[in-house]
């Protein structure tokens, strides 16, 4: 009996203590901002106990926990707010007055006045250098437009290094008809990801496929023009969207050429009327005014917020990886179930954009806007992100280039010997009989 007891004691499971994050409380008076920097592998959970608080313009519900990772956030208190937060990691947090909100309110009310005075809503282009708060401003303007009336502004992302309702590598235009997902690193989920907690958005997607605009400026401006054409079609067919307006988020100015040719193309193609400059002083606004005063009606400067954090290359890579992972697997509150399929290499037709990094421009003058065929091998496609187009598999390079993007897939494995590959799709089903475009982005699970 004692031997049996001793054996049972030996077989008892070993207890592991699950770490529990200690909840901390912050009291915010009206007009204050609570800021937190969340590293790539850390998570932050926040809850508004009482009061009215916003995260980049989206009001946070009382008593609801929000889990956020791989981001820098700023919770703005409209009213007296009690905020609880917890994290297993040590996070850098600060509380300070938000002196920028009066400027944002004035800009929002000016845009609202445009919507009320004309059937053609405001068309604005937000410009600035890297880490100037451009994207945060766009989120706030989109969210405030929804609060005013049942508007549906189109948000246009022209920065291929950051995804908006898509992984990085794409230019997108998305009608914003419902609140944004504050837990998402890419604004929210699109229709291709299936059922989610919040209303899915239906982005218009064009593939650029490269990381840097400088790798192929002619291609970038051609894709930008295609997206603008698609947006114009939506505006003509939807009076509500036309009245709501278009908010265009430009790439950082450091990524453009010295004469800002890409901005000129964006202003012309999207019929921009107002240039919003995010900068700490007037020098940039004056420079852009000299360059574009004949193309736009007005130029407005919004001061750079003191809470803006510089994003280095390591943080940007972490954000891109998080956006790719979220596209297929969801985030903390919305878990998605992607689907892996096996495909014969002979059934895959893959194209890719040309890059100045891989072409000797001194020996040849190729048509940089054309796509080139890719040999389906492990060396070219292993762990690659590919765009599945609407173009049939046997389409020409021109037809594939002009086609829109149906969805994004991840090639997880390529076996050259067996002539097979495995592809991760965001939804169950067979691989569409469509041509694919290889992007410069890779993701290793």
UniProtKB/Swiss-Prot annotation:
Cell location: Nucleus
Binding sites annotated in the UniProt record for ATP: 33, 131-136
Main location: nucleus
Chain ranges passing through the membrane: none
Keywords, ordered alphabetically: ATP-binding, mRNA processing, Nucleotide-binding, Nucleus
Database matches in Gene3D superfamilies: Clp1, DNA binding domain, P-loop containing nucleotide triphosphate hydrolases, Pre-mRNA cleavage complex subunit Clp1, C-terminal domain
GO molecular function, one term: polynucleotide 5'-hydroxyl-kinase activity
Gene Ontology biological-process annotations: mRNA 3'-end processing; tRNA splicing, via endonucleolytic cleavage and ligation
GO CC list: mRNA cleavage factor complex; nucleus
UniProt xrefs under Pfam families: Clp1, CLP1_N, CLP1_P
Function (record text): Required for endonucleolytic cleavage during polyadenylation-dependent pre-mRNA 3'-end formation.
Family, similarity comment: Belongs to the Clp1 family. Clp1 subfamily.
Name of this protein: mRNA cleavage and polyadenylation factor CLP1
Species the sequence originates in: Eremothecium gossypii (strain ATCC 10895 / CBS 109.51 / FGSC 9923 / NRRL Y-1056)
Gene name of the record: CLP1
């Amino acid at each position: 009996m004692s031997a049996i007891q001793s054996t049972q004691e030996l077989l008892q499971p070993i207890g592991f203590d699950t770490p529990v994050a200690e909840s901390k409380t912050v009291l915010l008076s009206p007009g204050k901002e609570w800021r937190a920097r969340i590293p790539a592998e850390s998570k932050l959970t926040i809850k508004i106990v009482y009061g009215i608080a916003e995260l980049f313009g989206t009001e946070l519900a009382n008593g609801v926990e929000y889990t956020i990772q791989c981001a820098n956030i700023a919770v703005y208190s409209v009213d007296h707010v009690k905020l609880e937060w917890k994290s297993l990691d040590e996070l850098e947090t600060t509380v300070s007055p938000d002196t920028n909100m009066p400027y944002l309110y004035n800009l929002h009310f000016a845009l609202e006045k445009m919507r009320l005075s004309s059937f053609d809503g405001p068309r604005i282009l937000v410009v600035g250098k890297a880490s100037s708060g451009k994207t945060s401003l766009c989120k706030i303007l989109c969210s405030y437009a929804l609060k005013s009336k049942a508007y549906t502004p189109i948000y246009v992302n022209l920065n291929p290094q950051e995804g908006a309702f898509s992984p990085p590598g794409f230019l997108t235009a998305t009608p914003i008809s419902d609140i944004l997902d504050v837990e998402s690193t890419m604004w929210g989920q699109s229709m291709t990801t299936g059922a989610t907690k919040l209303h899915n958005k239906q982005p218009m997607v064009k593939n650029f496929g490269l990381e840097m605009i400088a790798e192929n400026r002619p291609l970038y401006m051609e894709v930008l023009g295609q997206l603008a054409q698609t947006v114009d079609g939506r505006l003509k067919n939807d009076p509500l969207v036309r009245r709501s307006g278009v908010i265009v988020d430009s790439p950082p100015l450091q990524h453009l050429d010295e004469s800002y040719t890409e901005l000129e193309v964006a202003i012309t193609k999207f019929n921009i009327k107002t240039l919003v400059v995010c900068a700490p002083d007037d020098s940039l606004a004056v420079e852009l005014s000299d360059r574009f005063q004949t193309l736009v009606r007005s130029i407005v400067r919004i001061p750079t917020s003191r809470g803006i954090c510089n994003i280095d290359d390591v943080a940007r890579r972490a954000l891109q990886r998080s956006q790719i992972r979220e596209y297929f697997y969801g985030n903390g509150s919305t878990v998605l179930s992607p689907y892996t399929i096996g495909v014969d290499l002979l059934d895959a037709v893959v194209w890719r954009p040309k890059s100045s990094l891989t072409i000797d421009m001194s020996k040849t003058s190729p048509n940089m806007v054309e796509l080139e065929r890719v040999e389906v091998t492990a060396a070219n496609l292993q762990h690659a992100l590919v765009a599945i187009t609407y173009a049939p598999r046997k389409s020409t390079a021109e037809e594939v280039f002009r086609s829109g993007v149906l969805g994004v897939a991840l090639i997880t494995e390529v076996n050259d010997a067996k002539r097979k590959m495995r592809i991760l799709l965001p939804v169950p089903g067979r691989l569409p009989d469509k041509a694919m475009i290889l992007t410069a982005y890779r993701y290793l699970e």
